[in-house]
Amino acid sequence: MVKSVVSTVHFDVMDLPFSRRGSWLAISWIKASHPTRHVPEGLYLRTVRDRGDYQQLFRIDLPADGGREIRAEASPSIMHLFPGGTKNERSGVVDVCIPTTSSVRFRGRGTLLRLSSIPGSELSYAIPRGEGSWIVNMLGAGLRLMLTPLRGKLHVDAPWQAQGSQPMRFEMHPDIAGEFDIVIEEFAQALTPNRLHPPFEDEAAAIEADFLAFAARHGGEGPFSETADIARYILWSCIVNPEGAITRPTVLATKDRLTGIWSWDHCFTALALCPGDPALAWNQIMTIFDHQDEFGALPDAVFDRRVVQNFTKPPVHGWAIGRMLKLGCLDRAMKEEAYLHLARWTDFWFSYRDYDGDGVPQYDHGNDSGWDNASPFILRPPLEAPDLATFLILQMDTLAVLADELERSKEAIAWREKSTAFLRLATSHLTRRGRMDFVVSGTHEEIPNESLLPYLQLLLGNRLTESTRTSLLKSLEEEGYITQWGIATESTLSRHYSSDGYWLGPIWAPSTFLMVDALFRSGENNLAKEIGSRFLDLVETSGFAENFDAITGAPLRERAFAWTASTYLILARDISARP
């Protein structure tokens, strides 16, 4: 009996890659306007390893109707492809699933399937394996694939040219009943062809069950459940198995272009995962800390093949782990690990990022702040920064809490004293015009700016003076930061504001979440809920983009970002729980 797989979650492959938990494979629509992509627009089978243009393994075409546009519809378990750009099964359909983390399966009726390689190294090749299977070695991607037809006929056009096969084209033709079925498996050195696969529907049903189990652990509240389902799909599908420098099961930033883990993105994802799956959330934190160096520094980002160590990211980790502690996500072993790593991370900033020796650490570059091109960094760094001081104060507070819970009472006292002393030093040292602001390390010249970054000091809540809080809140509401969609990263009145300027204006998930938390901590509950609700509305309208036009709400850059999905889920949960 044929099983029917029904999903309540559906999405557009034009916006979201089709993948599954654990897999390094995905199917994505690559747009002609996509930055840094140098391949023709179309639908591609990809690896999400760090391979640049070589991520694209095969372009997918359905040659029926003269090879016109493909229409794609997807759920977490199955993607349906229709030739001719219209949903009409009489013209043929190809169903796709990802039955294991290392394979993709295509089943078709009434159409052909064409897979075409992207021009690359002359050493890439295709050779017959026997039993109808072919082995494809893609040098640029660093992958070997086996194509095994389960039903129908595989036609191969891959002429040998001295040391390889370029170009390579594979076509699946239906059998006499008008159907075909083929599985593509990735492997390293050895794999035996297997023609005995479970029925397609059984494999799709198992995928759907895996997603539903994940979704059940990360349930949404309130009226946001439909979009929350997509958010949970993004998190589930962005998980990869450990490989290379990625040492644990980890949620990538996206399975679109930026397929790595950055050393502050991961905190927001961990917070979203924490209530439903503390172990996965902790892996999300530790994937970065596994690469903490001998000085205590964290890398900028981690990919499967490389660790980016020439930049870093801000110490938001104490703030994030402090929230995880309040959620009850960490067992004693996790707390021990957190304490040791956070202590070294904190010491790094005071020991190695304070070149003028004044006790106030600095950023060497905008990338180190996470806000790469924010307006304070238009002038030459190093810059001493209010957000950096704030994060270090909060990190020492979290270290004190951890020390208490680990029965390290003397260390807890020491961390609280250090936090209090640094708060006093930072506020006296950085305060200009009634608030902490950016200054040049060494000269302490003020850096005039209209960035949202200085407002993150509101995370200190009532530890700031009342006059400082009042001044910050007044300018936040009156000076062009708050729009109908949320909170801009640069005042919309600023001469540096740019609608698609990355950190020079667009709305981002992490800045929104940090500001919502800051406003709650400052007692501005109504404003916090209003900004959080506007962000939820923004995502409902424009999807899970990397960032958004602060004026129009239009989605910008990547379209399936995990920290946008994470922030959506956290805010939906937190705002609905607030009176």
Question: Predicted regions span which residues?
Answer:
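Short, ordered beta-strand-loop transition motifs
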Residues: 1, 96-102, 164, 174, ...
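Terminal accessory carbohydrate-recognition/targeting modules of carbohydrate-active enzymes
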Residues: 1-223, 256, 521, 562, ...
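The feature captures the catalytic groove of carbohydrate-active enzymes
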Residues: 171-196, 295, 300-316, 323, ...
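Extended, well-ordered alpha-helical scaffold segments
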Residues: 196-199, 203-206, 210, 223-230, ...
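Extended glycan-interaction surfaces of carbohydrate-active proteins
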Residues: 218-259, 284-307, 354-384, 421-507, ...
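Aromatic- and histidine-enriched alpha-helix N-cap/loop-to-helix transition segments
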Residues: 257-268, 276, 308-319, 337-341, ...
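Alpha-helical support elements that line or immediately flank enzyme active sites
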Residues: 260-291, 453-465, 512-525, 532
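Specific register positions within alpha-helical solenoid repeats of the TPR/Sel1-like families, i.e.
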Residues: 271-275, 319-326, 397, 404, ...
